Every structure is written in structure tokens, then in C-alpha cells.
Amino acid sequence: MTNLYDETVEILEIHDKTIADIEYIGSSETKINTNKALELMKKTNYHSGYGGQEIADNLMIKGNGFIMTRGEYDGSEWWNYMQTDPSLPQVERDVKSFKTNRGWDSLEGINDLEGGE
């Protein structure tokens, strides 16, 4: 069993964040009081492995410099963490294609730009 609160804290810690960095919990249509949401998360245990999805698929957490959304594949669930203010390159590079013919390749890999700036 996975505890939703513990899972959330673990993901935050991996990214050097804490519960104190959370600014919003809910969905794009529903805001939940943060303290009440955290208390409910502490009481929420679920099977994160394969099977049926148990946690709301539109649950999200927005915080200082990040957003977390629920990921799911075939019933397996997790938090997706995305930095909202990433340090991005300032130098433009020539790109010839967005499409890969090898599958699961990066923009840099498709355009032979690995390791450069």
C-alpha cells in the first residue's frame, strides 16, 4: 500500500522541496484548503501498482517553482513533477525535425545536437 501523503513528501524531497513550498492543492476546477488536503492525504492509502486507478486523475499540486500532476499507466499511479521555472538555454540552435523514426528520441538526438549548447 502507498500512502498519498508519504508519496508526496518523498517526491518533494527528491526535488529539494518541502510541504511548506506547496501553494495550491486541487484540480484546475477545484481548490482545496491546503491543510485539509494534507490531512486527507495522510489518511489515503492506495495500491500504486497495476490494476484500477484509485486517485483522482486530475489531482494536482502547485508550489514555489513546480507543479505536480498524477501519472497513470494501466492502473499504475505516481506523481509527475515538473519545474515551472527551469533554467533554459539562451543560445538558439538549428533544428531540422521534431519527428523521430527510431522512436523515443529527444529533440537533440533527432537533430544530432547531443552535448552542445
Task: Describe each model-derived feature in a short phrase.
Residues 1-117:
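Acidic interaction surfaces
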